[in-house]
Amino acid sequence: MTRGILIFAFSNEKIDYLEQADWVADRVNTYLDLPVTIITDTKSINGRKFKHNLILSDAISGGQRNFKHTEEGNVGTWYNSNRFQSYNLSPYDETIAIDSDYVVNSDQLLRVFESKHDVLCHRDVYDITGTNRFAPYNTFGKHKFPHYWATVLFFRKSKMGKEMFQLMEMVKDNYTHYSNLYKFSGNIMRNDFIVSISLSILYGHKLDAIPTIPWAMPSAYDDVDLEQLDDTKFKISYTKTTNGEKKPYKSIINGTDFHFINKFALDKVIHA
């Protein structure tokens, strides 16, 4: 039984996703002692050499987006629509597909492999700043459909695992239809929405029957800054409104995985 981590990393005009994935892959080797396969393209590689296993695929655009909501001028192409290929491209029997901005900082993900379920992801997130910025992401669309996160997606090579990614491909190919059905904007393709809808179909639309990773995913929004203090210790900087006044705060993250959405701050850490 082989186990490993899968990361999709297609760079664009603004962010070198492949470089970030390579940095995260090093941390996977250190803290999980697992092999990593990165799905990318020749444009992202750009003549460079990487020590981790690379599989080439044509990048599929999910649309244009601003990669930092708090600033203008960070609009680029979001090549985020290849996730449905995970089942066919993964060389492992059991796989955890993670985003390139998921900072592996412990061995906690190893617990996911112990699950009896063949497909798992996070339903809940925990804002590590305490500002509750992710509350609006608990549901999506006018029908308030439950929001599941594609950031960490575990699957086994099994009948159910295969069906999950077949459903994801179907939802991706018919994204406009599903955006109309679930009443959300279809301008940008979101893997979270694709995973959420696919899980619902997979479990016969019985939402209470959908199993999830049994802990909330620590996360930070794209207006949070980051500094690495040592191997497992990071300092985050952010503003928080107290008594109607915005004030600067700092917190320490130590020995805990976290989803860090500010790609530009993550890039500074990688090059520090």
Residue ranges and their predicted role:
Residues 17, 61-70, 128-134:
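Short, charged, surface-exposed secondary-structure boundary motifs
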